[in-house]
Amino acid sequence: MATGPGGVTSHGGCTEDDDDIKVAALNALQQMDPEKAGPVLKRVLARRDTQSVCLRRKAIFLLAQQGAEGAEPTLLDAARHDPDPEVREQAVFWLSQVGTDASVAALDSILRTTKDPDLMEKAVFALSQQGSDRSIQALRAYAERSDVSEEGREKAIFWLGQTGTSENIAFLRGLYGRLRGEELKKKVLFSLAQTGSKENARWLAGVARNQQEAPELRKQALFWAEQCDLPTSEFASLYGSTADRAMREQVIFVLSQRGDKAAADKLFEIAKSDPDKELRKKALFWLGQMDDPRVAEVLQDILEH
């Protein structure tokens, strides 16, 4: 908050004594005759001067509250061209609340044209709340773009995963193979893991097995696969299918978290016969944390031989 000339309080370019009366007039007009208020609100929103910032903020709220047909072009114009960030962001938010085909088209247009990362992020969220075919297509197109921020693409990927539809799951799996950035790939792994389906868990296990994939991504895929309801045998078999020590360490950890008989059996096998002494030691450590009556016998056997 700042104090303007003559001690007048100012909020982000708004002067209270200048705007209070005008805002009150807008409110009164809206309550008295919404049809007449519409054109007035649109004229207010067409202004770009600093003196009308607070008035425009109020006008965009009132216009959205009207729910009148044809508000989308005005909201879109404000989202694209208003010099005040708050007005632009409010315009995007209210476009998401209109819920018409025209509003989805407007949000899509913002995604395709704006260079403002904050506005892009809000448009991604707004589209994610629509649930229409067109909004989903817009999010998919945005997730594939390489000329926008990774953070925005990550959010589009996240929201696509939240829908849980088979079409979006198939899209995300296909997208994974086309992505180059590790962070974006990690977001796909995370989004698919959130569905909790065995089908996606097996797909994640497949990524973990892929020796052409980056080690960190393989470990991430294994971590998320473990959160799903896959049988322990899937993870036990993964140990033998990789020669990478870091991956084997991750498999040992995953097995230790399973805590069932099959996991203990595999850890016993590793502790007894793995040629890598460090991996045997890790298996022994985790066996010591498990509540399995056979552990003491195995440890004694190792000590005696």
What do these predicted ranges mean?
Residues D19-D20, T50-C54, E69, D84-E86, ...:
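Alpha-helix N-cap/helix-start positions at coil->helix boundaries
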Residues L29, D33, L63, G67, ...:
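Alpha-solenoid repeat junctions
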Residues A236-G240, R245, Q250-I252:
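Alpha-helical adaptor scaffolds
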Residues E249-M290:
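Ankyrin-repeat and related helical/solenoid repeat scaffolds used for protein-protein interactions
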